[in-house]
Swiss-Prot record:
Name of this protein: tRNA1(Val) (adenine(37)-N6)-methyltransferase
PROSITE patterns associated with the record: N6_MTASE
Protein role: Specifically methylates the adenine in position 37 of tRNA(1)(Val) (anticodon cmo5UAC).
Gene3D superfamilies noted in UniProt: Vaccinia Virus protein VP39
Organism: Pseudoalteromonas translucida (strain TAC 125)
Lineage, broadest ranks: Bacteria, Pseudomonadati, Pseudomonadota, Gammaproteobacteria, Alteromonadales
Length: 232
């Protein structure tokens, strides 16, 4: 199996354009799930985020949406082989997805390349570029599928953060928590973990280095992810 083995589940990813990545692991471990009963994973890919969140909060009712047929099939297989086969997966675009009940938490590791050159792999282009799911459409989907107390957590490259925050603000959303991520202490900030809601409150800021100066996983990263990695 081509994939990644975690402590409680395995994720095959050979059929997916976007493989298991540190971005996904960061978001799945970091997202605030407190007081939540329902969660929507937008663009689930391998099913990684849905599985991580279910491990963290087994009481969650989780729904995952994936537009790509091969990734959808892979997510189904990964979820069926996990301890939580009742995670629901839909093959359709989030733009056309509807739910009778709003979700408490929405989570996404979205496409983020706005103006970059594309390769020949159509599925990978869809997974990585905003043509198939723009930031505006992502925010619109959250607003359609949420309630007044819902939260929206995502991870983005630092270069896209200002644009996303501006769009979110224009749509009545507020940044509540923001964790800036570096690969190592001497590297520039490369990623931002963010949670938005309809509530205007003081932003909780934090920082995280994935590895230390000796190229070992940092204490903070281990504390965040040790429930998942086999060798932590």
């Amino acid at each position: 199996m081509s994939g990644f083995a975690f402590k409680q589940f395995k994720v095959a990813h050979e059929q997916c354009a976007m493989k298991v990545s540190t971005d996904g692991i960061l978001l799945g471990a970091w997202a605030n799930l407190s007081n939540a009963n329902s969660l929507l994973d937008i663009g689930t890919g391998t099913g990684l985020l849905a599985l991580m969140c279910k491990q963290r909060s087994p009481q969650l009712t989780i729904t995952a949406v994936e537009v790509d047929k091969n990734a959808y099939q892979q997510a189904l297989q990964n979820i069926a082989a996990s301890p939580w086969p009742n995670i629901e997966v839909h093959q359709q675009s989030i733009q056309t997805f509807n739910s009778a009940q709003p979700f408490d938490v929405v989570i996404a590791n979205p496409p983020y390349f706005n103006h970059s050159l594309k390769g020949n792999n159509k599925a990978r282009n869809i997974a990585r570029h905003t043509d198939g799911l723009s930031f505006a459409e992502l925010i619109s989907a959250f607003k359609k599928l949420s309630h007044a107390g819902s939260t929206f957590s995502l991870i983005l490259p630092t270069t896209e953060v200002a644009v996303f925050i501006e769009l979110a603000t224009q749509n009545g959303l507020f940044l509540n928590t923001h964790c800036q991520v570096k690969a190592t202490p001497n590297k520039a900030i490369s990623r931002s973990l963010m949670t938005f809601s309809y509530i205007n409150q003081s932003i909780v800021e934090s920082a995280l280095c994935i590895k230390d100066n000796e190229n070992n996983y940092s204490e903070d990263y281990i504390a965040l992810c040790k429930a998942f990695y086999l060798k932590m």
